[in-house]
């Protein structure tokens, strides 16, 4: 009987439970970001984390109308670093163990130029708290699936920033739903 209830109610709702948990757990960090008036935000990551950065930046632009860009962390020295100035928010996605040290090194270069740093990483990498201004954690899962999980906090960031600005997140301006039938 208990197994049937778990299959019927809990398993189909796991994604919603995670989103609820994330909203409660991460609300403080997002309110901090939403409460600051950042003119520009940059997302940096490597490998799969770069793809997560692209999605996070897109969602932030779409619903909060804040200029944001995603860059491969290794490319910062090729011009992008010149855009970093005092008070710029740089969000680093650091979920890939083998790329963690290189990405944090790039983030610290941004910090030396006055950037405000947010780190998104997995639980257990608490040493990041000494290097960034605030940290958001996601559960550690197989690295092949971490991208799907890590993008959720960035989508929530876009949501919280938009709500803080008093924007309608359900009807972003100048965006249209489109369907192409071939």
Q: Where are the language model's segments positioned?
A:
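A SIS-like phosphosugar-recognition module
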Residues: 1-182
């Amino acid at each position: 009987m208990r197994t049937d209830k778990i299959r019927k109610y809990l398993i189909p709702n796991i994604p919603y439970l995670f989103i609820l948990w994330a909203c409660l757990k991460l609300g403080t960090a997002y309110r901090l970001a939403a409460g600051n008036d950042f003119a520009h935000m940059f997302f940096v990551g490597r490998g799969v984390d770069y793809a997560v950065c692209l999605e996070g930046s897109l969602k932030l632009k779409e619903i909060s109308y804040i200029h944001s860009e995603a860059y491969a962390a290794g490319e910062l020295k090729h011009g992008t670093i010149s855009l970093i100035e005092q008070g710029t928010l740089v969000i680093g996605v650091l979920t890939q163990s083998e790329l963690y040290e290189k990405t944090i090194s790039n983030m610290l270069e941004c910090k030396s130029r006055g950037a405000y740093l947010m780190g998104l990483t997995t639980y257990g990498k608490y040493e990041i708290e000494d290097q960034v201004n605030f940290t958001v954690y996601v559960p550690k899962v197989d690295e092949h699936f971490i991208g799907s999980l890590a993008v959720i906090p960035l989508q929530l960031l876009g949501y919280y920033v938009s709500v803080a600005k008093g924007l309608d997140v359900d009807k972003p301006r100048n965006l249209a739903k489109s369907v192409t039938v071939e």
